[in-house]
C-alpha cells in the first residue's frame, strides 16, 4: 500500500487538528465568528496582532517577528518584518508552518524604496503558525523572534486568525 506524501499528511493533520479545536472551542468560536475581522493590525513594538471589526479590536494575539525586527523591511534577506498597508491575499492550508496567510508585500512604496537603492524588495511574507518540522525546541519558537521576516503565532492562535479573516482582509503593520 503506498504511503501518503508529506503535503497530504500535513493537510490531513491540519484538518484533524481543526476538527478537534472546533469541538473544544465551538461555542466561543461561533460567538466570535459572528464578528469576522474586517482589518488586521500588527504592532511590532508590542509583538501583538489585533483583529478589528468596525475599527475596534475584538481579539489580540502574541506574535513573533523576523530575526531583525527593528525598522521596516528594505530588501530581500534582511530578516525584517515589513511596515505599511497590505492585504491578506492568499491562504495556504498545506504550509510548512501549520497554516499561512500571504501578505501582499511588497506594495508600491516598498518597491520604489528598494528600486532607489537597486535592491530586490523580497517577498513571500506570511502570517503563519509554528514549523511542522521544527529544528529547535518549541520554547525557542514561542519566545524569540525567529522568522525570515514573517509574522508567527502559535498554531492555536493561527487557526483562530485563519477562521476569523476572509481573503483580501486589509492588514496594517506598524512599528
Question: What is each model feature region?
Answer:
Residues 1-8:
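N-terminal secretory signal peptides that target proteins for export/translocation
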Residues 25-27:
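N-terminal signal peptide c-region/cleavage motif recognized by signal peptidases
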